[in-house]
């Protein structure tokens, strides 16, 4: 299990946080600011770097995403053909998304996703590909 809480990630030349863990992960009360890529990436890299696996229980709560160079929350396993959902049980709750005109989340091959009580200062676009049981409130 991992808890990542009360941090500021500012001007990182890659993604702010690469998260791949089968246990419980809590990402709470962080500020992702001016990172070159996504603020948070959930990957499942079985194609190139082989450095990560599927996530099974993730809470992303009360964070601020302030101008990330790419989509702030990217949930994207590196599969080319959908062979079923990879990431499961992801809750994205009470976050603030600033300065975005495009997608604020891009979610692929995932199930049991809850997106609730987030603040979108500009765009609230959420892209979903091959997902099951996604709830947006």
Segments the model singles out, each with a brief description of its role:
Residues 86, 99-101, 109-137:
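Extended beta-solenoid/beta-helix repeat architectures
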Residues 14, 46-51, 77-82:
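Short, recurring structural edge motifs at helix starts
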Residues 72, 86-91:
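Generic long, charged, amphipathic alpha-helical segments
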């Amino acid at each position: 299990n991992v808890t990542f809480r009360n941090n500021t990630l500012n001007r990182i030349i890659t993604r702010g946080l690469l998260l791949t863990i089968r246990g419980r992960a809590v990402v709470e009360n962080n500020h992702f600011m001016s990172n070159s890529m996504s603020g948070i990436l959930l990957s499942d890299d079985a194609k190139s770097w082989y450095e990560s696996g599927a996530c099974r229980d993730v809470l992303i709560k009360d964070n601020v995403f302030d101008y990330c160079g790419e989509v702030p929350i990217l949930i994207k396993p590196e599969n080319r053909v959908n062979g079923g959902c990879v990431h499961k049980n992801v809750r994205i709750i009470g976050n603030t998304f600033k300065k975005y005109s495009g997608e604020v989340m891009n979610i692929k091959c995932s199930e049991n996703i809850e997106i609730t009580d987030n603040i979108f200062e500009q765009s609230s676009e959420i892209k979903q590909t091959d997902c099951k049981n996604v709830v947006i409130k």
